[in-house]
Amino acid sequence: MKNKLRQIKENREKYRKLKEEELREKTKQLKERAKQESLEELMVEAYSNVWEGAARVLKLEAYDVQLIGAMVLNKGQIAEMKTGEGKSLVAAFASYLNALSGKGVHIVTVNDYLAKRDERWIGEVLRYLGLKTAVITNESSREERKKGYEADVTYITNSELGFDYLRDHMAWSKEEIVQREFNYCIIDEVDSILIDEARTPLIISGPTKGSEKPYKVAWEIGKRMKEGEDYELEEKSKQVILKEKGIKRCEEALEVKDIFSMETPWAHYVMNAIKAKHFYIKDVNYIIKEGEVVIVDEFTGRIMGGRRWADGLHQAIEAKEGVKIQEESETLASITYQNLFLLYPKLAGMTGTAKTEEEEFEQIYGLKVVSIPTHRKMKRKDYPDVVYRTSRSKWMAVAEECERMWTKGRPVLVGTTSIEKSELLARLLEEKGVKYKLLNARPSLAADEASIIAQAGKIGSITIATNMAGRGTDIILGGNIKEAFGEWIKERKKQVDIEEEWRKVLEGKADEESEKKYKQLKEEHEKEQKRVKQLGGLYVIGTERHESRRIDNQLRGRSGRQGDEGSSRFFISLEDDLLRIFGGGQMGEIMSRLGVEEPLESAFLSKSLDRAQKKVENYYYQMRKQLFEYDQVLNSQRKAIYKERTDILRSEEVGEWSKSYIRKEWPGGLLGIKRGMRNRSEVEISYDVKKMQMESVQAGLMNELERLLLLQQIDKSWSKHLKEMSLLREFIAWRGYAQRDPLVEYKNESYNLFIKMIEEIRQGYAYSLFRSQA
């Protein structure tokens, strides 16, 4: 890499002398050469071009470490780069190089705000060099999506990408398909998408006729059942295990013989009710908004509008809360992020925290993690954890620490794990008269997320935020001049393009008043930044160790960006979830036996905390690995069905498919022919008769009817199959208690279900075709 870096730096000097049109011409030449040469051979010239483009358009000079990061991305690896090291610019180099093939590049971000920001900001460099860029958001129309995927570089969120993939495989005509074949993808915050969200499948569902009654009945039974007597809980995996007494109690209450029957799966309803009772807590896992249960993302703390828990769990929570129970949805299509991103021939990622999960990235995705050194030396001090015996004493200590810092004027960012806890701290600070900004999933607060986080580095700023809220937005010591200028310009002009006004200011092309305001803000910012640095920079307080050291490191990483001063400390208690579930009881015993005063700092406790956290990390890794193993079974079936469906959709003539399906499921009974008389000529004759009938009405009608009925039958049977696979997955775990390997059982039974589905598709299609009337 050092040799390549030296070549790029030497070559870049030539590019300084080139005119804008000459840089664009370079892009055209490189595109032509990409047809014959490898991207590795084009890298030196491509990266030199982007470097010069960024210097001219954004006034940004790339650092050596950014160029190294870009080389890592081009290799199809993960570049671990700390907060504030300029990952967005790094992606510009690798995306430009890989776009030269003409096959398209996707840059995937965690939210629409970041996708729009990067396409507008970094995308300007790519457009300057002659590439086409596009952004696809939640609001994009089908036409905009289609055009967006045709661009050289497309900025998009992981969920939009996944749902477009699923919708394309439910399309009824070629014109409805928006995506082209996947080529190269760079995932920003790759750990958030490929690890934190790996357990949550993307689901497209449709309403199904169902009754509210089973959920209400199951809730009434579930809330009266007793833990330990009727059921046991596996808190780590959020699983419910019904005991013999509990099963009998359910069967008596419901007056059924077997609650595990596939025909009347009452066990499914009751276990969901018990899960809703114990594991899904209001203002932690969800909020009630306008009479609806709305999910709160456990990793980002944001509400997930439009998303619902699958398999009847959402309805169970609605029954618990006494709100309107919405119709249970029928899964029409689904895919996990694990399998979605494995569809790319070449995949890369960026994040500030990946090294702790490098085994998982390597094992599941085949992605190597490469740590990129920081441009400036890290100055942040990470202090040892302070441990309290009770949660109450911990929160009092956090509030006191915030008050102490607020009095000094030092900015503080406090990370909490839920809405409930963020509001608890807010109340404690109010009692002390400490001013703060609160950021959590409540809609009234979430709207200002980016601006609140951007100004969290100002003097006297106390910001309480759930989990990873504001990730992707830099916290600049002394505040963010751009945000402050944006607020001022909005007050001055009602209809204003802030990005355009900001660009004019940077280029010295703004009006006199704007130039004057910018100068004033810059002077104020420099003074404030100096003062904040003297106070020690941003102080990050963690209020709970997370299930992964990586998430703790993300919170710490909000401080000390680009060599800034800063510090972090975690305040934790033995009542926190991590310690309670994975070993807090043992430490509580030791502390009470030793009669230790609160609070406590010790090497022994820190090691115990690390051990507990590693245990959790390994536990969840094994869960994700198991999910991946099970999902591979469904994934191979999905690939087969989607290939068949796509081939039918894209084919000009579908007659051969039609005949193939009919031969295997000849519905002779419909024509008064005995089953035993089936032969090839009968099939051909009957098919030709049907075709003549249809063609006599309209030329090409038979072909379109066949296509429609084939797609219809595939979709109907696939949706039914997904439901059966979901039930099988839920009940198969019980085989483990009978000393049988659940995964082997799942593979065997899912194969039988798949064969049954194929037969249903053929049979259903054959009958539909011969029953159809012109």
Swiss-Prot record:
ATP binds at Q66, G84, E85, G86, K87, S88, D474. It catalyses: ATP + H2O + cellular proteinSide 1 = ADP + phosphate + cellular proteinSide 2. It comes from Cyanidioschyzon merolae (strain NIES-3377 / 10D). The lineage of its organism: Eukaryota, Rhodophyta, Bangiophyceae, Cyanidiales, Cyanidiaceae. Pfam families: P-loop_SecA, SecA_DEAD, SecA_PP_bind, SecA_SW. Its EC number is 7.4.2.8. Has a central role in coupling the hydrolysis of ATP to the transfer of proteins across the thylakoid membrane. The gene is secA. GO terms for cellular component: chloroplast stroma; chloroplast thylakoid membrane. PROSITE patterns: SECA (PS01312), SECA_MOTOR_DEAD (PS51196). Keywords: ATP-binding, Chloroplast, Membrane, Nucleotide-binding, Plastid, Protein transport, Thylakoid, Translocase, Translocation, Transport. It is found in: Plastid, Chloroplast stroma; Plastid, Chloroplast thylakoid membrane. It is a peripheral membrane protein. GO terms for biological process: intracellular protein transmembrane transport; protein import; protein targeting. This is Protein translocase subunit SecA. GO terms for molecular function: ATP binding; protein-exporting ATPase activity. NCBIfam families: PRK12904.1, secA. Belongs to the SecA family. It comes from the Eukaryota.
